[in-house]
């Protein structure tokens, strides 16, 4: 046997050893779902498996330029009115780039609120009165003509969705509008782990223990597992008395490789869906404009 053939044989042997290690280290201790788990992992490894997010659309968390560009995109494409001379609140503002972008768009006042001080130090230093973790400050500075809640609803902690919406309603002006982008956990990128693994539905296709094994590390994804998101959103809005001005469901059809895979059956079984959740999996976002 020549060297080239020997290398090929060794590669085949290494692959078989790796497969055997998976079975020994994971599948055998978890025999209940061993077959479906293994098939799911093999499907996700395929280069043909769709990405969760187009890489060109992922904001580089280490790039200030990317963060500013994202903030501009949210204001320009999502808020359907001029901010000039209006009071603006970004609920769940994170580092706060959208808060500053609102000022760039001539808002008379812009405030960023978050439950934790994760504000950008440089932005906060230059705009000390524009960031707070104290809700009483939000109330004091209100009411607001435009309130943004962008990709926050599905991450709420410590308070119910109804309580949060009621709080927001109290600081919204009589003719004001609440812009809400919902990002369901059931969407292809709803786990927010595309920086670690940019595979569509990986956060749902694998259980937490399976995902930890698949990635070789534990991922702390703080997203509320809402299996029927559209109902949850509508029920919350109804319970708080907001009027729905517009509701826009942003769908993406499931690719054949996903539809035809055993992963759909695994998801259905793992999360006790009565039927295959193809509708839920096809909803990427739900956008609302709400008023009093």
Q: Across the structure, where does each feature detected by a protein language model lie?
A:
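A conserved beta-strand element that flanks and buttresses the S-adenosyl-L-methionine
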Residues: 148
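Acceptor-substrate binding/catalytic loop of class I
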Residues: 217-232
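Class I SAM-dependent methyltransferase Rossmann-like catalytic core
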Residues: 47-73
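A C-terminal cap/extension of S-adenosyl-L-methionine-dependent methyltransferases
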Residues: 127, 234-238, 244-292
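A short glycine-rich, Lys/Arg-flanked "PGG" loop and its adjoining helix->strand segment in the class I
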Residues: 162-174
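Class I SAM-dependent methyltransferase SAM/SAH-binding core
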Residues: 95-137
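Conserved class I S-adenosyl-L-methionine
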Residues: 86-94, 179-206
């Amino acid at each position: 046997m020549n060297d080239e053939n020997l290398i090929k044989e060794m590669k085949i042997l290494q692959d078989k050893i790796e497969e055997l290690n998976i079975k020994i280290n994971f599948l055998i201790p978890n025999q209940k779902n061993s077959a479906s788990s293994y098939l799911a992992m093999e499907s996700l490894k395929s280069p043909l498996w769709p990405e969760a997010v187009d890489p060109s659309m992922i904001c580089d968390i280490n790039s200030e330029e990317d963060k500013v560009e994202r903030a501009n995109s949210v204001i320009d494409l999502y808020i359907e009115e001029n901010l000039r001379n209006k009071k603006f609140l970004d609920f769940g503002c994170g580092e706060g780039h959208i808060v500053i972008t609102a000022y760039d768009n001539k808002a008379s006042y812009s405030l960023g609120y978050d439950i934790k001080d994760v504000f950008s130090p440089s932005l906060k230093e230059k705009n000390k009165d524009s960031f707070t973790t104290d809700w009483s400050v939000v109330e004091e500075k209100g009411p607001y003509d435009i309130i943004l809640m962008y990709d926050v609803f599905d991450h709420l902690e410590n308070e119910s969705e109804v309580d949060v919406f009621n709080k927001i309603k109290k600081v919204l002006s009589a003719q004001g509008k609440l812009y809400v982008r919902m990002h369901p956990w059931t969407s292809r990128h709803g786990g927010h782990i595309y920086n670690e693994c940019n595979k569509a539905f990986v956060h749902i296709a694998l259980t937490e223990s399976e995902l930890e094994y698949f990635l070789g590390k534990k991922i702390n994804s703080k997203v509320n597992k809402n299996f029927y998101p559209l109902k949850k959103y509508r029920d919350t809005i109804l319970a708080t008395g907001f009027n729905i001005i517009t509701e826009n469901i942003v769908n993406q059809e499931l690719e054949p490789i996903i539809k035809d895979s055993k992963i759909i059956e695994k998801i259905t079984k793992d999360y006790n869906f009565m039927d295959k959740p193809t509708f839920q999996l096809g909803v990427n976002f739900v956008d609302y404009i709400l008023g009093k």
